[in-house]
């Protein structure tokens, strides 16, 4: 026994050497463990120091700013209110507009919704936001590209009208003499947006040529015609490069469902031979009705475009609170829709009508109201017709 450590007397020299090596290695490990303990203690002290620093005003401000952006993306009005209450944003149209224009971490759909509201503050922010855009010496398409990239244009007609009116005023202020009035700029802007859709939407088969585009815009310059070279340049620019529409999420459909017109659980009657009711999560947005198996699904099980469809209440002996989507004056054709099968294949729908049951009478009425609003006439065409009529009336009033 040596230093209180037991050592068997009958060990061979080789075994004694092995035992000595083990003891030495044990001592080295004990030293290493102690060193690691000291390093861990230092690291814990550093972590505690970092946690203490997180209590600093700068980090607290950054955290609250991130929280405010998140709130804005979910509810723009509440997000702005949160930032103002925490003194992260001044409650002035100019400061709010600058915050939206910079757009750091902001959802462009939410920006568009906020700018389109009719409240006095929102209207002032809209004009301050538009004033941050520099359109001097840009042709109309170039200016529209810049403007429409800074937010996502909302779907409501009145919101679009206010935003495009503000754009037309700003463009004419930056480029005096190009158009005789803001009405002309407004009408031509819509004509360009619709041209972009017609030329680049694969569902539009009848692509307008230059001559038709020129003919569409005759007489809009206070009764006179715009220079054909101007219209040709605008047409060529759109034909060669479509507008880039902001998408707040890159690779899936999530952005489509960010701010729906309506969403909720409904029962849908199947279109197969055996008619069964299935519970689905429905989302109404962008003039389409999407349905999912679960609220957490990123991809819908089915898509029902609402174009050319109507809606009506129906009685069903099996389910209460029913309504139907149908084609008016239908002569046996199926509704244009698609669904995803269990094996992932996308197939055409098999419905002449879609019968749906809501949980309550109140929810049924709300769904019918929302869907009726979604299947209304294209707001672009309504507003364009109204503005052209205004130009025509103004011209007649000016005639002796």
UniProtKB/Swiss-Prot annotation:
Effect noted on mutating residue 278 to A: Strongly reduces phosphatidylinositol 3,4,5-trisphosphate binding
Tissue expression profile of the protein: Present in all tissues tested, with highest protein levels in brain and adrenal.
Outcome (variant: residue 301 to A): Abolishes phosphatidylinositol 3,4,5-trisphosphate binding
Domain of life: Eukaryota
Gene Ontology CC: adherens junction; bicellular tight junction; cytoplasm; glutamatergic synapse; growth cone; plasma membrane; postsynapse
Membrane topology term: Peripheral membrane protein
Gene3D superfamilies linked: 1.10.220.20, Arf Nucleotide-binding Site Opener,domain 2, Pleckstrin-homology domain (PH domain)/Phosphotyrosine-binding domain (PTB)
GO MF entries: guanyl-nucleotide exchange factor activity; inositol 1,4,5 trisphosphate binding; lipid binding
Keyword Hydrolase: no
List of residues binding a 1,2-diacyl-sn-glycero-3-phospho-(1D-myo-inositol-3,4,5-trisphosphate): 268-276, 280, 291, 301, 339, 350-351
Span of domain PH: 259-376
Residues in coiled coil: 10-67
SUPFAM superfamilies in the cross-refs: PH domain-like (SSF50729), Sec7 domain (SSF48425)
This protein's UniProt keywords: Cell junction, Cell membrane, Cell projection, Coiled coil, Cytoplasm, Guanine-nucleotide releasing factor, Lipid-binding, Membrane, Tight junction
The protein's role, per its UniProt record: Acts as a guanine-nucleotide exchange factor (GEF). Promotes guanine-nucleotide exchange on ARF1, ARF3 and ARF6. Activates ARF factors through replacement of GDP with GTP. The cell membrane form, in association with ARL4 proteins, recruits ARF6 to the plasma membrane. Involved in neurite growth.
UniProt domain comment: Binds via its PH domain to the inositol head group of phosphatidylinositol 3,4,5-trisphosphate. The PH domain is necessary and sufficient for plasma membrane relocalization.
Subunit structure: Heteromer. Composed of TAMALIN, CYTH2 and at least one GRM1. Interacts with ARRB1. Interacts with ARL4D; the interaction is direct. Directly interacts with CCDC120 through the coiled coil domain; this interaction stabilizes CCDC120, possibly by preventing its ubiquitination, and is required for neurite growth in a neuroblastoma cell line. Interacts with FRMD4A. Interacts (via N-terminal domain) with INAVA (via N-terminal domain).
Protein's recorded name: Cytohesin-2
């Amino acid at each position: 026994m040596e230093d209180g450590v037991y050592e068997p007397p009958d060990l061979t020299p080789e075994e004694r050497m092995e035992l000595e090596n083990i003891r030495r290695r044990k001592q080295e490990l004990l030293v290493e463990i102690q060193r690691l303990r000291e390093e861990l203690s230092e690291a814990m002290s550093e972590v505690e120091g970092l946690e203490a620093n997180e209590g600093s005003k700068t980090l607290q401000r950054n955290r609250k700013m991130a929280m405010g952006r998140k709130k804005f993306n979910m509810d723009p009005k509440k997000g702005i209110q949160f930032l103002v209450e925490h003194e992260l944003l001044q409650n002035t149209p100019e400061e709010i507009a600058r915050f939206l224009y910079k757009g750091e971490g902001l959802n462009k759909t939410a920006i568009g919704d906020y700018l389109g509201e009719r409240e006095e503050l929102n209207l002032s922010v809209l004009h301050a936001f538009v004033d941050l855009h520099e359109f001097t010496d840009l042709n109309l398409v170039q200016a529209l590209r810049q403007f429409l990239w800074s937010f996502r244009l909302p779907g409501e007609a009145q919101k679009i009208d206010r935003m495009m009116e503000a754009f037309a005023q700003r463009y004419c202020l930056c480029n005096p003499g190009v158009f005789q009035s803001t009405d002309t700029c407004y009408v031509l802007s819509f004509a360009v947006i619709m041209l972009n859709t017609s030329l680049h939407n694969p569902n539009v088969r009848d692509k307008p040529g230059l001559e038709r585009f020129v003919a569409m815009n005759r007489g809009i310059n206070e009764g006179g015609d715009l220079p054909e070279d101007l219209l040709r340049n605008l047409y060529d620019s759109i034909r060669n490069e479509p507008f880039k529409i902001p998408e707040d999420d890159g690779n899936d459909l999530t952005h489509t469902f960010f701010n729906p017109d309506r969403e909720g659980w409904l029962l849908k009657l199947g279109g197969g031979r055996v008619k069964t009711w299935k519970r689905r999560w429905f989302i109404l947005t962008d003039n389409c009705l999407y349905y999912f198996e679960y609220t957490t699904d990123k991809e819908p099980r089915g898509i029902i475009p609402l174009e050319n469809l109507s809606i009506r209440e129906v009685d069903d002996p099996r389910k209460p609170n029913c309504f139907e989507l149908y084609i008016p004056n239908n002569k046996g054709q199926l509704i244009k829709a698609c669904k995803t099968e269990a094996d992932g294949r996308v197939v055409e729908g098999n419905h002449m009508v879609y019968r749906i049951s809501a949980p309550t009478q109140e929810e049924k009425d709300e769904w019918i109201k929302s869907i009726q609003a979604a299947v209304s006439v294209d707001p672009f065409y309504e507003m364009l017709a109204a503005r052209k009529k205004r130009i025509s009336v103004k011209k007649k009033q000016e005639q002796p």
